[in-house]
């Protein structure tokens, strides 16, 4: 009997230890927040950017507004809300923006715990930050949401695709560019952990669902780029998302591109797609 009890105990430990581990440290497997460095301040200053401060349930948050390089009267013709990957920071977008349309303005949004932002990230809190950042931008520009909404587009990479789609859905944004999107976080868990551990996922980002909602908006125009050699999020996920909405979504698989180098490799193509997607706002 003692031997049987020991065996049962060992089996229970073998079953529940991974479960407890995954539930306890799941956020650390998904999010990789970092503080800003001196070089980021230099990038912000060179771009003539300003901080846009706001508060959410997670405390004080900071996004960054980058004005158009081209002089313009009144509000910018297009404002891109940009959401980075889970290991990047909002100001990292500034390595690319100089090569894109000079009429574009940008609101670079960090997640809770990233950069200068307090709190801890979850899908709901990231969604809250996107909405609150947009509201803060309207005040910063002295505009109304109704004035900014038709001028707004979203751009996301990796995890930022989920954030961008949530913002697009919440703000009724029709112009979307996504780089290396996943289908759902549970699908990603299946790749990394297998079944059934993938269903322990507490951070249930669902790009299938959100993309379907955004694609249903009249006039929606969505472009997806995905590296053919992406070693983190397989390109079949990007293809699957696009295939569900062929009338609205254009898919580009990029030969030779990996997960973290796609932005640098095809920055020019991305910029051209952004100009095309936002064409109605730029006319």
What are the residue ranges of the model-derived segments?
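C-terminal catalytic histidine-bearing segment of alpha/beta-hydrolase fold enzymes
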Residues: 236-283
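Alpha/beta-hydrolase fold nucleophile elbow
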Residues: 143-158
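An N-terminal hydrophobic leader/cap segment in hydrolases
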Residues: 7-54
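Membrane-embedded segments
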Residues: 60-136
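Hydrolase active-site cap/lid region
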Residues: 161-214
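Glycine-rich nucleophile elbow surrounding the catalytic serine of serine-hydrolase chemistry
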Residues: 155-166, 232
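Short beta-strand/loop motif that positions the catalytic acidic residue
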Residues: 214-219, 223-230
């Amino acid at each position: 009997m003692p031997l049987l009890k020991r065996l049962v105990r060992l089996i229970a430990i073998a079953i529940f230890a991974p479960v407890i581990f995954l539930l306890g440290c799941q956020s650390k497997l998904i999010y990789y927040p970092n503080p800003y460095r001196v070089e980021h301040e230099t990038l912000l200053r060179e771009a003539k950017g300003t901080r846009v401060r706001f508060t959410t349930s997670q405390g004080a948050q900071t996004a960054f507004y980058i004005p158009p390089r081209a002089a313009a009267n009144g509000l910018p013709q297009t404002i891109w809300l940009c959401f980075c990957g889970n290991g990047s920071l909002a100001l990292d977008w500034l390595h690319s923006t100089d090569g894109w349309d000079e009429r574009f303005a940008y609101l670079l949004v960090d997640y809770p715990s990233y950069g200068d932002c307090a709190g801890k990230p979850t899908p709901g809190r990231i969604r809250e930050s996107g909405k609150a950042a947009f509201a803060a931008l309207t005040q910063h520009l002295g505009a109304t949401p109704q004035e900014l909404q038709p001028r707004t587009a979203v751009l996301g990479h990796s995890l930022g695709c989920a954030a961008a789609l949530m913002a697009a859905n919440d703000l009724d944004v029709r112009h979307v560019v996504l780089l290396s999107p996943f289908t759902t976080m549970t699908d990603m868990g299946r790749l990394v952990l297998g079944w059934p551990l993938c269903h322990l996922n507490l951070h249930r980002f669902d790009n299938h669902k959100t993309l379907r909602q955004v694609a249903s908006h009249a006039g929606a125009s969505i472009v997806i780029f995905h590296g053919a050699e992406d070693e983190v999020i397989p390109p079949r996920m990007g293809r699957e998302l696009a295939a569900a909405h062929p009338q609205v979504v254009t898919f580009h698989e990029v030969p030779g591109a990996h997960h973290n180098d796609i932005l640098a490799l095809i920055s020019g193509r991305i910029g051209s797609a952004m100009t095309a997607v936002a064409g109605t706002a730029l006319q």
